[in-house]
Regions:
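Radical SAM enzyme [4Fe-4S]-AdoMet core and its adjacent flexible, acidic
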Residues: 4, 8, 99-102, 122-282, ...
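Short, flexible helix/strand-to-coil boundary loops that buttress conserved ligand/catalytic motifs
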Residues: 43, 116, 142, 285, ...
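Short, solvent-exposed beta-strand edge segments and adjacent coil->beta transition regions
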Residues: 24-26, 169, 322, 326
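Conserved alpha-helical substructure of the radical SAM core
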Residues: 2-118, 124-125, 136, 205, ...
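Short, intrinsically disordered, charge-biased short linear motifs at domain edges
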Residues: 25-26, 250-255, 274, 305-316
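Flexible mid-to-C-terminal extensions adjoining Fe-S/redox cofactors in radical SAM and related proteins
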Residues: 10-14, 18-19, 262-264, 280-360
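Conserved residues at the C-terminal ends of beta-strands
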Residues: 45, 79, 129, 200, ...
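Structured loop/turn residues at beta-strand edges in well-structured enzyme cores
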Residues: 22, 71, 121, 192, ...
Length: 360
């Protein structure tokens, strides 16, 4: 009998607590850097064309997924750009089921209404971006007039998700433009019948501005939530309290980071295995000043061997005290899984989530 996601999670957790050979829990693959939005807090939809060239074909993508499965990775996130612009996305989701991986897709939801049944049959978790309840503000933040279309997509997905055994989540990016609305978005996510909401403070790196095209809408200076830091400190305790009544999946430990402003945490990049759109693994993580990329498709290395190489282990050690990043996908796992005794409540919450949605 195949192991469930919960058993995989617990097995990896206990192994990593006692062994120096640390295994990743999660994988992520950048499906594409193409995007049909032009968000003011994200550079990808605003990039110059040269950064969008080259993507794995279906066969290559499945080879990456096979390596993830062979390494006992529990779940894979399909990221972008906008993953639904890949016509083979459902096929990739079905391959995940075949090899025993949970699949999660982060999408802007623009194509969801017309594809809800197909997506929810193929994938385990759909995470749909919704940052505001104001259509005009949505247009200003996301650069496209698609608010009604996205909400319709969420509703259609919720209708079929139960029968298709797929969890529907909302993801809200917190930036200076929507801080006042966050509690209302949380409440609306529950009204829509979704399985939960994730809250993600917008991340900005200085070098991202060097990648944007002429006419870019990327505006980190005005969209930075730190412009309204005093209001963030009022918002965070409110969200922590709302977790008692609303399905906020974001951990207390992540939220408290933005209450205290203390980003001097121990980074654990071994928790996540990140692969870009051409099949290269990023070492030690996706966005450090020393990150290098290595192909997993050219036959020169296998993930399972390369992960424990001296080169990779050394790179991870160099960023263990990194304080230049507050990306959700790094901060939260590093706190919950890297400091479990301090964040036991969050760890138990994660285990509960796997028990609820871990169908593999």
């Amino acid at each position: 009998m195949p192991r469930t996601a919960t058993r995989k999670f617990m097995g990896t957790f206990f192994h990593n607590r006692v062994s120096s050979r640390k295994y990743p829990f999660f994988g992520s693959v950048e499906c594409t850097r193409r995007c049909n939005s032009r968000c003011t807090f994200c550079p990808i939809g605003n990039e110059r064309p040269e950064f969008k060239k080259g993507e794995m074909d279906t066969e290559q993508f499945c080879r990456i997924l096979d390596q993830f499965a062979g390494f006992d990775i529990i779940a894979v996130s399909f990221l972008g750009g906008e993953p639904t612009l890949r016509k083979d996305l459902p096929e990739l989701g079905r391959h995940c089921k075949k090899v025993g991986l949970l699949s999660q897709v982060s999408t802007n939801g623009i194509t969801l209404a017309d594809n809800a049944d197909e997506y929810t049959k193929a994938l385990d978790v759909l995470v749909v971006s919704l940052d505001t309840l104001d259509p005009e503000k949505y247009k200003n933040i996301r650069g496209v007039d698609k608010y009604d279309q996205v909400v319709s997509g969420v509703k259609e997905a919720v209708k079929v998700a139960g029968a298709n055994k797929c969890a529907i989540l909302v993801n809200t990016v917190i930036c200076s433009a929507n801080i006042d609305e966050i509690p209302s978005v949380v409440k609306y996510a529950k009204e829509l019948g979704t399985d939960g909401i994730m809250l993600d403070f917008a991340t900005f790196h200085d070098y991202w501005t060097t990648m944007t095209a002429q006419g870019s809408r990327y505006d980190p200076k005005s969209m930075d939530w730190r412009n309204r830091a005093a209001e963030v400190k009022k918002l965070v305790p409110m969200l922590i309290e709302m977790r008692k009544k609303y399905p906020i999946l974001t951990s207390k430990s992540y939220l408290k980071t933005f209450l205290t402003g203390d980003f001097h945490y121990r980074c654990h990049p071994y928790l996540f295995c990140c692969v870009n759109k051409t099949g290269e693994i990023s070492v030690p993580c996706y966005d450090s000043s020393i990150t290098k990329f290595y192909s997993l498709l050219d036959g020169s290395r296998r993930l399972k061997d390369f992960w424990f190489s001296p080169e990779v282990i050394s790179a991870r050690r160099q960023v263990k005290d990194c304080t230049t990043c507050y990306m959700h996908c790094i901060v939260e796992p590093s706190k919950v899984l890297g400091e479990p005794l301090r964040n036991m409540g969050d760890l138990l919450g994660w285990i509960g989530t796997f028990q609820k949605h871990g169908r593999v």
